[in-house]
Amino acid sequence: SYISEEEELERVIPLIEAVRTRSAVPLSVDTRKAAVMKAAFKAGATLCNDISALTDDPTLGTLIAKEDGAVVLMHKRGTPPTMQQELPQYGNVVTEVRDYLEQRALYALNCGIAHERIIIDYGIGFGKTVEDNYRLIAASAYFTSLGYPLLVGLSRKSFIGAVTGQAPEQRLTGTLAATMYAVQQGASIVRVHDAAETRELLLVLKELRKYGIH
C-alpha cells in the first residue's frame, strides 16, 4: 500500500540532506507527491521520478517547472500492488506505450518543464507481460526517436528470470545483456543494482564504438 506524505518525508529528506553534505552528485527522488518533491528540491534533489507520469498530483508538473527541475515520465498500467496480477491486454504494446509517453511529455512541456529536462521510461515490469517487456526493450530506438532521453530500469527484473530461471540476485549477466542492448539502441540512463559491473560494460561498449563502421 502507499505510504503517507508524512512518512515519505521522514524517510526521504534526511537521506538527501546527508548525501548533500558529502557529494554534489545529482539525486533522483521517486515520488508522486508535489509536497514531497518541493521539500526534496529544497534539500538538494535535482530529479523527480514519477511513476504516474504527472497524472496523480495535478500540481507536481508546475512545481518541477518552477524549481527548474527534471522529471522522469514512466508508463504503467494499474497500481503497484495489483499491476502484475491483472495484466492488461495491449493491441500493440510498443506503439501504445510510445504514444502515451509522447502525450505525457507534451503535458510536461505545457507545465513549463524544459524539453531538455524531460526523460521517458517505458516502465519495464509495470503492468506488462514478459513478452511485452522484451518487445519494449527491443524497440528502444523507437522511443529515443521521440527526442527525449530514455531511462531504462532493467536490473534483476523478472523478465530476465523468466528466460534464465535464476533468482533476482543471480541475474547480473542477463541484466548486463539487456542493458547493453538498450544502450546500443539509444538509452541514455540505466538504473542498476550492480553499478561497478555496469560501469565496466559501458566503458568497453564506449571503446568499441570508437572503432565501429561510420
Protein language model features and the residues they cover:
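Phosphate/pyrophosphate-binding loops at sites that engage ATP/ADP/AMP, CoA/4′-phosphopantetheine
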Residues: 104-117
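Active-site-adjacent loop and "lid" segments of alpha/beta metabolic enzymes
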Residues: 1-26, 31-35, 41-42, 46-107, ...
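Short strand-loop junctions, especially beta-strand C-caps/beta-turns
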Residues: 123-125
